[in-house]
Amino acid sequence: MARYSSDLNTWVVRDSTSARLDGDCGIITLAVLCGAATGSRGVYEKAADLLTRHGIYDGTGTKVLKLKSLMQKMFGGGTRFTRQCIGMTLDAYLAARPGWSGVAICKHGDICHGIPVVHGVAYNTNNGEWMGYDLIATLRINLEAQ
């Protein structure tokens, strides 16, 4: 996963993961790859697939519309939730290539399709190459309403 550096407000990315689930206290942790980084399929479609694989979303009906509705509820204020950037998902390009690591600057105000996006740079320790990337931050969501 990633290690948080509080003094720099950055995430040092150690490796990539597409999802991590925490069953305690009804908290779900999910990270979604940016659609543009991995092909033609969009963010919501990828998120729907991710949730379906873990049994959170049943996959019936129109995935995109249902997931948009879920996101709107989570960010709309009707449901109390706690959001923290606790992990990072590098795009498929970085994940498939050894030697890459990254530092992502958390920008909580940046919203893409209703999901916080993290912008950062990646560095290849093998050849010194740098590359910019956009990531969707991991969300730590408490869905328990109050």
Label the predicted regions:
Residues 48-137:
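Conserved active-site-adjacent core of cysteine acyl-enzyme catalytic domains
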Residues 1-54:
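Active-site-adjacent structural segments surrounding the nucleophilic cysteine of cysteine proteases
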